[in-house]
From Swiss-Prot:
The gene is Slc29a2. The chain crosses the membrane at residues 13-29, 69-93, 98-116, 125-143, 161-185, 193-213, 292-311, 324-342, 360-378, 394-413, 432-452. It catalyses: uridine(out) = uridine(in); inosine(in) = inosine(out); adenosine(in) = adenosine(out); thymidine(in) = thymidine(out). Bidirectional uniporter involved in the facilitative transport of nucleosides and nucleobases, and contributes to maintaining their cellular homeostasis. Functions as a Na(+)-independent, passive transporter. Involved in the transport of nucleosides such as inosine, adenosine, uridine, thymidine, cytidine and guanosine. Also able to transport purine nucleobases (hypoxanthine, adenine, guanine) and pyrimidine nucleobases (thymine, uracil). Involved in nucleoside transport at basolateral membrane of kidney cells, allowing liver absorption of nucleoside metabolites. One of its GO terms (cellular component) is plasma membrane. Belongs to the SLC29A/ENT transporter (TC 2.A.57) family. It comes from Rattus norvegicus (Rat). Keywords: Cell membrane, Glycoprotein, Membrane, Phosphoprotein, Transmembrane, Transmembrane helix, Transport. It comes from the Eukaryota. Transport activity is insensitive to nanomolar concentrations of the inhibitor nitrobenzylmercaptopurine riboside (NBMPR). Inhibited by higher concentrations of NBMPR (1uM-10uM). Residues 1-12, 94-97, 144-160, 214-291, 343-359, 414-431 are cytoplasmic. This is Equilibrative nucleoside transporter 2.
Length: 456
């Protein structure tokens, strides 16, 4: 069918729905890591969210290694379900996967909010929280993969809106934390309000998903979905690797350069090329993109090895106990990272440098390892071995700015270059491989964070 026969997206309701769904897929991860001060305050034995980044890192609560565990248990499900996607998608209907995941995430986040009012021992609170983190992020992995499958049937604009929603999830969480801190209410009420916020976001996501079958525009495209459930994984791969000109942002902190995935154009091309090539070999495709895939792994390994495990421990060097000490980490760590990461991913919509034939990319990616010692030598009061060299706040802010924008740019660049290194009929496999290596890099970085934390 031609696009001219498609109904209009009245009031952009479908676009808004997919934007909110994108936001909902990454709200859990971002709200957990942004609330590290609250969790460390609870693990110190106090039911308070008043613990600020400037106070909680000097307490013995870091014996739980909360920062490290929340990162690892958030990323391992992504790696696991990347491997299980094909089997899972064939066994469970799409609507059950999406709606069931959203409801499970809502209930688990409601539990997290309820625990604000419940006095628990630090050990029990840690165990319950880690279990919630694992299951919430497992459902998020299923949800994200399933929604990518739906987006494969929609015009590319809706892929962009979905990814833009993901990109703003981290910024939204940081702003929610700042609002909570600035509210002036008691710490417990502030924490309760903070954790209710993502519950509202997930509830809106459920409403948006349930509304899609009632919107003519959504029905027009979603009914063209292939019958075989396994196609959802393939569509996800195509979404990741279809555009040769724009960046493809996929990570715990996403954003939205333009994607060029048009199902109508694909149908037209299919009619023009009746003789399709044989199924591409995974090994052959891997040989073509292995260096780009390695770069993607290294980018996320560096990022997750210090963010948020080390960066969330950095405090202001100011001796005054004023507002700046309370707002320093939420602003300079989480808000700055998410804004600059989003900016870095967006840059690939305008230029791609270095290109796929350049050997400069691996060198630039490896240079990011310098951020590990730089952050470890910043003002982290709780340390036993390394000295503090970069005392001033300006050092940390500068490092974070470069760290975040380089993460966003190189992630988007590698996801963009991979499909350019293979033949058109191999891009699907290339996208699937890059998805796996993305998850591998996240898990490797989360695992390394334990080592770097121990070296402080």
């Amino acid at each position: 069918m031609a696009h001219g026969n498609a109904p209009r997206d009245s009031y952009h309701l479908v676009g808004i729905s997919f934007f909110i769904l994108g936001l909902g897929t990454l709200l859990p991860w971002n709200f957990f890591i942004t609330a590290i001060p609250y969790f460390q305050g609870r693990l110190a034995g106090t039911n308070s969210s008043a613990e600020t980044p400037s106070t909680n890192h000097t307490s013995p609560t870091d014996t739980f290694n909360f920062n490290n565990w929340v990162t690892l248990l958030s990323q391992l499900p992504l790696l696991l379900f990347t491997l299980l996607n094909s089997f899972l998608y064939q066994c469970i209907p799409e609507s059950v996967r999406i709606l069931g995941s959203l409801l499970a995430i809502l209930l688990l986040f409601a539990l997290t909010a309820a625990l604000v009012k419940v006095d628990l021992s630090p050990g029990l609170f840690f165990s319950i929280t880690m279990a919630s983190v694992w299951f919430i992020n497992s459902f998020c992995a299923v949800l994200q993969g399933s929604l990518f499958g739906q987006l494969g049937t929609m015009p590319s604009t809706y892929s962009t809106l979905f990814l833009s929603g993901q990109g703003l999830a981290g910024i939204f969480a940081a702003l929610a934390m700042l609002t909570s801190l600035a509210s002036g209410v008691d710490p417990q009420t502030s924490a309760l309000g903070y954790f209710i916020t993502p519950c509202v976001g997930i509830l809106l996501s459920i409403i948006c998903y349930l509304s899609l079958p009632h919107l003519k525009f959504a029905r027009y495209y979603l009914t063209k979905k292939p019958q075989a459930p396994v196609q959802e994984l393939e569509t996800k791969a195509e979404l990741l690797g279809a555009d040769e000109k724009n960046g493809i942002p996929v990570s715990p902190q996403q954003a939205g350069p333009t994607l060029d995935l048009d199902p109508e154009k694909e149908l037209e091309l299919g009619l023009e090329e009746p003789q399709k090539p044989g199924k591409p070999s995974v090994f052959v495709v891997f040989r073509k993109i292995w260096l780009t895939a390695l770069c993607l792994v290294l980018v996320f390994t560096v990022t997750l090895s210090v963010f948020p495990a080390i960066t969330a421990m950095v405090t202001t060097s100011s001796n005054s106990p004023g507002k700046w000490s309370q707002f320093f980490n939420p602003i300079c760590c989480f808000l700055l990272f998410n804004v600059m990461d989003w900016l870095g991913r967006s840059l690939t919509s305008y230029f791609l440098w270095p290109d796929e034939d350049s050997q400069l990319l691996p060198l630039l990616v490896c240079l990011r390892f310098l951020f590990v010692p730089l952050f470890m030598l910043c003002h982290v009061p709780q340390r036993a071995r390394l000295p503090i060299i970069f005392w001033q706040d300006a050092y940390f802010i500068t490092f974070m700015l470069l760290f975040a924008i380089s993460n966003g740019y190189f992630v988007s660049l590698t996801m963009c270059l991979a499909p350019r290194q293979v033949l058109p009929h191999e891009r699907e496999v290339a996208g699937a491989l890059m998805t796996f290596f993305l998850a591998l890099g996240l898990s490797c970085g989360a695992s390394l964070s334990f080592l770097f934390k121990a070296l402080l």
